[in-house]
Design a protein with these regions (language model features):
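Solvent-exposed, non-transmembrane regions of membrane-associated and secreted proteins
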Residues: 1-235
Length: 235
């Protein structure tokens, strides 16, 4: 289950055992739905079998008109960038910095999420949105998709410590804010993403990404204690 304070994001987390990401087109009750459900790319066991269990992935549609599913992730992004209303042209909802999570504070960037047996708190350490010109392989890279795709020049390699460090560095560099958190290569990660707000065609590669690490309870699954270095976030 995912529930983010100050938003209407409050949904069960689903997983399609067929591996076909079927909850993109059906709701949590299995009924056909254009809004879909919140779902994992792979459950923990499957992700572990592919060697990508260190980065679990959660996604849902950006239901802009109804302002549901993961649309309000954009509100979190925008209010933390100093915006006062939703950037989507048909939303324009006023954004209250006193209600939406303040990612500069530990309380605001720490979210309670329970997925496939992991019931814990997760800390946001990077977030950013890419536009419709972004290479498609970014989605594969960010989510550690465990299969080659020659058409977009993506080659899957089972992550090792060097890859994880490179991946962390890439996400920190691209983050739209310095949140003052530097993850460890031994952390348990969670990548959450949804479609972009202003580049929203069916074939667009625009996405909004949030990168989190498990902090409570601290994960030791990948050799660490989930400790991280925190500095003062940039103003």
């Amino acid at each position: 289950w995912i529930k983010i304070q100050g938003t209407n994001i409050d949904y069960p987390i689903m997983y399609d055992a067929t591996g076909k990401l079927g909850y993109s087109g059906k709701d949590a009750d299995g009924k056909k739905s254009t809004s879909g459900a919140v779902y994992m790319h792979h459950n923990v066991a499957t992700a572990d079998s592919y060697g990508i269990g260190q980065n679990l992935v959660l996604t849902a549609h950006n239901s802009r008109v109804s302002k549901t599913m993961f649309h309000q992730l954009h509100h979190i992004q925008e209010v933390n960038l100093g915006k006062t209303e939703c950037a989507y042209r048909k939303c324009k909802e006023a954004l209250d910095p006193n209600t939406l999570p303040n990612l500069k504070t530990p309380e605001g960037r720490t979210w309670e999420i329970a997925l496939d047996g992991i019931d814990g708190k997760w800390e946001v350490w990077s977030f950013y949105e890419v536009n419709d010109k972004e290479p498609e392989k970014t989605l594969y890279y960010n989510t550690w998709w465990p299969a080659d795709n020659k058409s977009i020049k993506y080659t899957f390699k089972t992550p090792d410590a060097a890859f994880v460090q490179e991946w962390i560095d890439t996400q920190l560099k691209r983050s739209q804010m310095d949140l003052g958190v530097t993850p460890s290569t031994t952390d348990q990660f969670l990548t959450i993403y949804t479609c972009g707000d202003n580049h929203d065609s069916d074939t667009a590669t625009s996405r909004l990404y949030f990168f989190l690490r498990q902090v409570e309870p601290a994960s030791t699954k990948f050799g660490g204690t989930a400790a991280a270095t925190e500095t003062t976030p940039a103003a």
